[in-house]
């Protein structure tokens, strides 16, 4: 019999996905170990919609800003302002937001360790083990796990070691700079507005952003083109926003998955969540809500495994996610592939967003995380407007 410490669930990665899974399982009375590396902050605009605030009980004090509108900037510098009617998009600083989520999990009973994951192994009785290096002691430890949740981000080591096909995942790369909000504001500055730049020199296949974070701002961009300089593009973006002289607080970069992995479990005791599972929305790059939802679904699947012993239940995490959000991801993927492919198309895309029907349906879907079906005539109108832009018949 092994003398290694045993947990019901070991969760690798303490971002929104892993911390949410740890919290949910600990509240159910499960013995949970949450492993996370200290000092790792992911580049992220920090936007969380009302659905995330409601579903995951996010307190107001974590919101460093409340965005009341979005501005879309075309290649010609044409601007389209879109008000967020009757609500707001919460903005968080990931450094503090993620730590709060981890602390909430610990308060519910999860055990936290500052550690670097090394590998999944097998004990002498066949139970899985997790081997990690302690961040404080630099000592190697082994624990036993009845179930494992891999929430260790894009290029997940857990996924690549345990889930078939995970190594084939394709990625885009994101980079941003957190800067101090200047005391003397640029003439067009608005601390309650998210600015989105659809311009090829800032990204050949994505967009650049300037998002308010209260006393700071997130300024960044992303691309799948490995030869494209994200740092140079961000420098240009800062100049365009009048923030080239703002003090830089920190710089962060990381890969992001391009689409959900075809499989999230190993058919035995491992299930993936968050970026490790590929749940970053195409076109928008949104990941916080989907990561937290993925963490919750992974926790549900792990709980069912612990109760029933039936490993087939692990596949339910992906099935449930794709049932509710797969169509949205597919639509966003098509949209990004087409509209972000040239400045001519970007110009038409921004022009199309002047339409009030497009604005309302887009924000209704974003805020509530579901395709809006209540107004079929509006969908028909948008279809014909879309076709006019696709065929070049609409005025820009």
Language-model region placement:
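C-terminal helical "tail/cap" subdomain of flavin- and related membrane-associated enzymes
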Residues: 303-396
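Generic enzyme active-site microenvironment
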Residues: 34, 150, 273
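A conserved beta-strand/loop capping segment in the N-terminal third of enzymes
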Residues: 51-102, 114
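N-terminal Rossmann-fold NAD(P) dinucleotide-binding loop
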Residues: 18
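Beta1/beta-strand and adjacent pyrophosphate-binding region of the FAD-binding site
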Residues: 2-15
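Predominantly flavin-linked oxidoreductase catalytic cores and closely associated redox partners
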Residues: 104-246
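FAD/FMN-dependent oxidoreductases across multiple families
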Residues: 119, 225-307
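Glycine-rich FAD pyrophosphate-binding loop
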Residues: 10, 23-44
């Amino acid at each position: 019999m092994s003398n290694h410490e045993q947990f019901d669930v070991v969760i690798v990665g303490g971002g929104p996905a892993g911390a949410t899974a740890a919290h949910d399982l600990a509240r159910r009375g499960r013995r949970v170990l949450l492993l996370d590396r200290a000092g790792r902050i992911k580049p992220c605009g920090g936007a969380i919609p009302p659905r995330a605030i409601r579903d995951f009980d996010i307190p107001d004090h974590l919101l460093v800003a409340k965005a009341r509108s979005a501005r879309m900037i075309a290649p010609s510098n044409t601007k389209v302002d879109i008000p967020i009617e009757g609500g707001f998009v919460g903005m968080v600083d990931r450094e503090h937001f993620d730590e709060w989520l981890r602390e909430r999990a610990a308060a519910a009973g999860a055990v936290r360790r500052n550690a670097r994951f090394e590998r999944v192994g097998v004990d002498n009785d066949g139970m899985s083990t997790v081997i990690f290096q302690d961040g404080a002691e630099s000592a190697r430890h082994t624990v036993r796990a009845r179930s494992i949740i891999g929430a260790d981000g894009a290029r997940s080591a857990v996924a690549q070691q345990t889930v078939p096909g995970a190594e084939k995942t394709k990625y885009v790369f994101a980079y941003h700079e957190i800067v101090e909000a200047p005391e003397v504001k640029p003439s067009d500055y608005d601390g309650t507005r998210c600015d989105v730049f659809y311009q090829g020199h800032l990204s050949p296949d994505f967009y650049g952003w300037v998002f308010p974070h209260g006393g700071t701002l997130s300024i960044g961009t992303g691309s799948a083109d490995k030869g494209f300089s994200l740092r140079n593009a961000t420098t240009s973006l800062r100049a365009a926003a009048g923030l080239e002289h703002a003090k830089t607080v920190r710089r962060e970069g990381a890969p992001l998955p391009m689409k959900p992995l075809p499989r999230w479990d190993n058919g035995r005791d491992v299930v993936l969540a968050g970026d490790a599972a590929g749940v970053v929305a195409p076109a928008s790059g949104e990941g916080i809500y989907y990561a937290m939802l993925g963490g919750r679904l992974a926790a549900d699947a792990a709980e069912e495994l612990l109760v029933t012993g039936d490993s087939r239940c692990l596949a339910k995490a992906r099935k449930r996610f794709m049932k509710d959000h797969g169509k949205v991801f597919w639509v966003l993927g098509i949209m990004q592939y087409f509209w972000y492919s040239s400045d001519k198309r970007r110009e038409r895309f921004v022009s199309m967003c002047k339409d009030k029907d497009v604005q309302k349906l887009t924000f209704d879907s974003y805020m509530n995380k579901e395709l809006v079906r209540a107004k079929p005539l509006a969908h028909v109108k948008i279809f014909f407007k879309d076709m006019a832009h696709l065929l070049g018949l609409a005025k820009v």
